Amino acid sequence: MELNNLKPAEGAKHAKRRVGRGIGSGLGKTAGRGHKGQKSRSGGFHKVGFEGGQMPLQRRLPKRGFTSLTKEFVGEVRLGDLEKLPVDEIDLLALKQAGLVGELIKSAKIIATGELKRKIVVKGLGATKGARAAIEAAGGSFAE
């Protein structure tokens, strides 16, 4: 086998179907478009979702929910991540410096994932009920 002798396997390549090129091709006359109707005409198309004048599905269904504008500015921090921090007083600035939340975050909440075994003081951060219980059980406290 040499690079200049490589070729596709027998039957691997097929010629493209040429539509509208005579009755013998099997795709002559109407070229696979059928008879009459909008889709058989040149330039005949409709918008995505158009249902022939019937109210489209995306307009029949009610609007629901909304996009929160504050979502991207609120961060979540796990208890397990707080365990690894070298500081005992934890506030938003300490979380940003440790890289646990992004620079754009304006408020953060501690969630009860992982374990906390050391005493910490939390300042100006929210916490779930489970996280608050775990921090207080480890001897920690919340300073608002």
Curated annotation (Swiss-Prot):
Pfam families: Ribosomal_L27A (PF00828). One of its GO terms (biological process) is translation. Residues 21-31 have a biased composition (Gly residues). Residues 1-56 are annotated as: Disordered. One of its GO terms (cellular component) is cytosolic large ribosomal subunit. One of its GO terms (molecular function) is rRNA binding. It comes from the Bacteria. InterPro entries: Ribosomal_uL15 (IPR030878), Ribosomal_uL15/eL18 (IPR021131), Ribosomal_uL15/eL18_sf (IPR036227), Ribosomal_uL15_bac-type (IPR005749), Ribosomal_uL15_CS (IPR001196). Transmembrane segments: none annotated. HAMAP family: Ribosomal_uL15. Binds to the 23S rRNA. Belongs to the universal ribosomal protein uL15 family. This is Large ribosomal subunit protein uL15. It comes from Burkholderia mallei (strain ATCC 23344). The gene is rplO.
